[in-house]
Amino acid sequence: MKQWVGLGKFLAGHMQVIVPICVTLGVLFPQQIGVLKPIVPALFAFMTFQGALSNTFHQVAEVFRRPLHLILALFVSAVLIPIAAYAMSSLFFGSNPNLVCGIVLEYSVPVAVTAFMWISMFGGNGPLALTIILTSSVISPVTIPLTLKLLLGATVSIDVPSMMQNMAFMIAIPAVLGIVINELTRGWGHEKLSPALSPACKFMMMGVIASNSTAMSEYVLHMNVERLEVALFILVFAISGFIIGILVARALHLPYGETTTMCFTCGMRNISSGAVIATQYFPGEVVFPVMCGTLFQQVLASIIGHLFERLTGEERAKQRKRVEAGRDAMTR
């Protein structure tokens, strides 16, 4: 068991190398890796379950008792970043409204489910992350059409039942199940079961990333100058999303866990839902900016997560000492 857990830690420490390899494999071998697509929701659900084993219902309730961080994350991801995407894309690609539309749509969709995997890996606030992702998805049937209407004058409708069903299967049900097991076993789920499942989740994450990357194969293998410019823009703006989350959290002097959660929930988007909307309501040219995030999102999450973890090592050590001191004081 020690070797198995050690393998999980090794994989977690090298994700910044593993993730680009997974993306490359997905792009180069779409047919072979595409066979994983039918089981991706189940892989998501299992990873959510494993991450939720470290949480309690009391922690989730605290998010709603003090909702400032939740409201702030939703404001940044659903209002601030879409407006910034519209302003910057209009500046660089104003002559092509389809590209502007694709970029705005990319940053109008809900927070990515995969954000929870990275937040769990880098020690973020799990209950806050779950609440942000679920709330972002629940309000998206209102926020997406409203954003597109106000910024672009476009009208779309969202398949609400399908989206809610997916969120329930991938996030809500496995999260509740994980928390229930942790509560009933009085911490055994967090201390024993979660570490035992962690290595398997790392392999599942690789499969999910590679599978999602297959959607970009056609575009990447037939790249032109304009697409390259759009890809560069998406790369820079995607980095900005993570940084904005960190800066907002730092401005409010939030601790490491909450800052990590803000970083990933502001920087990561549910690209698959954006791709569905793009293909249903807009010309084909709109799809490329939306799907382009697939190339960078997971790679950036890995790199930025590791960089932030290193830069805050001293701060986290001080936090651990304060927590340990508090525990010692309570036991005396």
Which residues does each predicted region cover?
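Alpha-helical transmembrane segments of multi-pass small-molecule/ion transporters
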Residues: M1-R332
